[in-house]
């Protein structure tokens, strides 16, 4: 129970009701509050009978109900020969957060809001950070679900949907994604879309999160196939159907692919020590290719590797993309910031048996201080091959940005015999 504020207590002391047994019959009960407060709703929450004798205890209980909602920062009252006046100071807007309903799929959002506003006095799409209003909304949701034949548990938590929001969701029974129908799908992408449908099926349904996941996932598949202007509509959902202990919701979205884009040009502003020719080979993007964000990401990775193979582990690859929506072409411009070259610091061979460590030390004679490039890695691999270990050994790289050095760590997936 939220305690009545000090302001309320002070006003009570000014009132003429000095004992619980005394009664007072007001000619009227009025609300003194800013215009933003719905006075009729406040009177509903107070629930004081009109034209009836009231005790001090009844009035204090009514005010406690108002305070407990969390909607008011201060609550008080005064009495005179004409009226009982309840004074309300609303909570600051920072103490109220919008409500998000995650998976109440039996209703459209606007219809659910209307039902809750009718059932819970004081609720208008926002919930206070403290108080009983959230619990009242949860109870109303449980009652509404009972009318649909669903015995449910409803939870509320902050920041589930977005920052500064309260998410209410059905936690039992589970509400999950059923079938996903994609209207206007391209036949060439059906295998990937089928994989996506199987991945989403059975996941928890959330009207906002599911919509975002469907749209982003479908759009990514199309964009990686060159359809950069693709638009996937927010999915509509069917009425829930019971599926064993869960309720499944079938989704339908329409895909508008647009035209496929192709690469018009790739300009590489190479920086030493990697040449433009080597970067072009690593990027493997040519005019006429389908313009794919996935291919661009792969090119970025491969060009960074080209610099890392020269000892430049901090190299940055900066793509600039110019999209021509008329010709449906893409021009790429790529700039490079190599950073500082890294040098070999040490090698950790502790994953090997002691005799193998000794044999490796004899085979690998490179001294620290050389550039940590592909030649260093080749020398390590050559030394490992000479040992004929019979199990794979991976090379782990541990760069130290403060000294621009690299420690090499040998890693094994199988434990060698000692």
Segments (PLM) and residue ranges:
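N-terminal signal peptide c-region/cleavage motif recognized by signal peptidases
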Residues: 16-18
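Bacterial N-terminal signal peptides that target proteins for export
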Residues: 1-9
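Interaction-mediating elements
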Residues: 23-418
């Amino acid at each position: 129970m939220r305690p009545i504020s000090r302001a309320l207590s002070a006003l009570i002391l000014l009132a003429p009701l000095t004992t619980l047994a005394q009664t007072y019959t007001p000619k009227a009960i009025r609300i003194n509050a800013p215009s933003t407060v719905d006075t009729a709703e406040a009177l509903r929450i107070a629930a004081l009978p009109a034209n009836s004798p009231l005790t001090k205890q009844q009035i204090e209980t009514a005010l406690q109900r108002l305070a407990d909602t969390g909607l008011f920062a201060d609550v008080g009252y005064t009495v005179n020969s004409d009226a009982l006046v309840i004074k309300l100071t609303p909570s600051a807007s920072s103490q109220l957060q919008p409500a998000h309903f995650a998976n109440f799929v039996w209703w459209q959002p606007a219809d659910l809001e209307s039902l809750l506003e009718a059932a819970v006095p004081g609720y208008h799409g926002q919930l206070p950070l403290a108080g009983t209003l959230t619990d009242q909304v949860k109870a109303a949701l449980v009652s509404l679900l009972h009318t649909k034949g669903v015995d449910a548990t409803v939870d509320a938590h902050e920041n589930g949907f977005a920052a500064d929001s309260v998410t209410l969701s059905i936690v039992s029974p589970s509400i999950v994604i059923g079938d996903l129908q994609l209207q206007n799908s391209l036949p060439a992408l059906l295998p990937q879309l089928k994989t996506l449908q199987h991945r989403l099926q059975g996941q928890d349904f959330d009207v906002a999160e599911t919509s975002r996941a469907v749209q982003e996932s479908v759009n990514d598949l199309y964009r990686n196939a060159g359809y950069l202007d693709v638009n996937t509509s927010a999915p509509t959902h069917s009425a829930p159907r019971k599926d064993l202990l869960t309720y499944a919701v079938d989704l339908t979205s329409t895909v508008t692919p647009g035209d496929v884009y192709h690469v018009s040009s790739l300009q590489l502003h190479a920086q030493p020590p990697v040449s433009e020719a080597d970067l072009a080979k690593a990027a493997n993007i040519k005019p006429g290719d389908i313009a794919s964000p996935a291919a661009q990401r792969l090119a970025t990775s491969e060009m960074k590797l080209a610099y890392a193979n020269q000892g430049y582990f901090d190299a940055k690859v900066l793509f600039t993309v110019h999209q021509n929506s008329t010709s449906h072409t893409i021009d790429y411009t790529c700039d490079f910031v190599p950073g500082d070259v890294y040098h070999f610091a040490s090698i950790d061979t502790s994953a090997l048996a002691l005799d193998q460590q000794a044999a490796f030390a004899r085979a690998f004679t490179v001294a620290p201080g050389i550039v940590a490039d592909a030649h260093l890695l080749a020398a390590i691999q050559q030394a490992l091959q000479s040992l004929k270990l019979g199990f794979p050994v991976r090379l782990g790289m541990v760069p130290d940005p403060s000294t621009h050095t690299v420690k090499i760590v040998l890693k094994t997936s199988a434990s060698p015999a000692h």
